[in-house]
């Protein structure tokens, strides 16, 4: 990459220039603006009589918070444009708002998100709780099977679903779209549990990745799954904990290894009173080991979410 100052070697170049509303021509029109966007109400009307605005130039609102939100997406433009057309013809329809839903295809993986992040949820007055899972994207024995890494955020008090982020080689958009449906209907984790989602080995797992993550989050909320998130671990929350390798085979250098299938009582070398951090490849075996250790009196265990 050659600039006016020097040349830079790179393995990959990402052009992320961003966009901005092209509304300079509206200066002096009397339209109420905010940072170059046209402010509208739920019907798509501006502050000027009989003038509507839609698309990348128009500000809409967030469906969860009700606050103004800029969503320069083709989907938003088409949905709000159709609504405005109906309102011009006499309807009185209100736009329900956006969730910041997005999907992106990267080399070898896909990324998607919708709703609030954990940080945004806290700023909006929710009591957020989240979980990170690593789950199969289809039956593990089926050709082309891979994994999703999913983060799900909900309000701890009401159990309302607030957001989802997912990355993986498979169809992340389906996980995102299920979450969008739940969030737009103000659904709780209880409302969305045990849904009869499409299943066949080429397409999904018997318990859908979305439902699997929801179940894990409910276990965490109900105190059945004691964890550190990767963020908590990075901030030093696991200081003073003994790391225990719970992988299928020994995989963590310097950490004592415990084979889940052999635990039938207290584990030699592990004090039931000490703080123990259980780590495996994806978090599942560590969770199963945590349950066994709890049964045998180990009450100070944590699992590293996501492995």
Q: What does each of the following model-derived ranges do?
A:
Residues 7-83, 179-182:
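FAD-site-proximal beta/loop scaffold in flavoenzymes
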Residues 57-170, 202-205, 209-236, 241:
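Mid-to-C-terminal Rossmann-like scaffold of FAD/NAD(P)H-dependent oxidoreductases
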Residues 3, 15, 53, 244-245, ...:
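Redox-cofactor binding/interface segments in oxidoreductases and associated redox assembly factors
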Residues 1-7:
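Conserved beta-strand-loop-beta-strand element in the redox core of flavoprotein oxidoreductases
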């Amino acid at each position: 990459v050659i600039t006016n100052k020097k040349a830079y070697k790179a393995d990959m170049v990402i052009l992320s220039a961003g966009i901005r509303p092209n509304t300079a021509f509206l200066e002096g029109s009397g339209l109420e603006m905010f940072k170059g966007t046209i402010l509208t109400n739920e019907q798509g009307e501006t502050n000027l009589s009989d003038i509507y605005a839609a698309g990348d130039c128009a500000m809409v609102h967030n469906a969860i918070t009700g606050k103004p939100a800029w969503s320069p997406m083709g989907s938003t433009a088409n949905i709000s444009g159709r609504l405005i057309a109906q309102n011009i013809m006499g309807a009185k329809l209100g736009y329900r708002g956006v969730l910041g839903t997005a999907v992106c295809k990267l080399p070898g993986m896909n990324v998607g998100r919708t709703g609030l992040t954990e940080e945004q949820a806290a700023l909006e007055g929710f009591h957020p709780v989240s979980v990170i899972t690593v789950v199969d994207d289809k039956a593990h024995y089926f050709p082309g099977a891979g994994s999703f890494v999913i983060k799900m955020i909900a309000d701890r008090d009401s159990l309302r679903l607030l957001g989802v982020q997912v990355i993986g080689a498979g169809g992340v958009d389906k996980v995102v779209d299920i979450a969008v449906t739940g969030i737009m209907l103000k659904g709780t984790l209880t409302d969305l549990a045990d849904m009869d989602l499409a299943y066949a080995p080429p397409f999904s797992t018997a318990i859908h990745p979305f439902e699997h993550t929801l179940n894990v989050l409910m276990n965490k909320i109900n105190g059945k799954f004691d964890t550190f998130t990767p963020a908590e671990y990075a901030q030093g929350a696991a200081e003073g904990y003994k790391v225990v390798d719970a992988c299928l085979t020994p995989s963590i250098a310097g950490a004592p290894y415990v084979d889940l299938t052999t635990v039938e009582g207290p584990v030699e070398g592990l004090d039931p009173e000490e703080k123990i951090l259980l780590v495996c490849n994806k978090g599942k075996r560590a969770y199963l080991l945590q349950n066994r250790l709890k049964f045998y009196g180990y009450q100070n265990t944590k699992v590293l979410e996501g492995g």
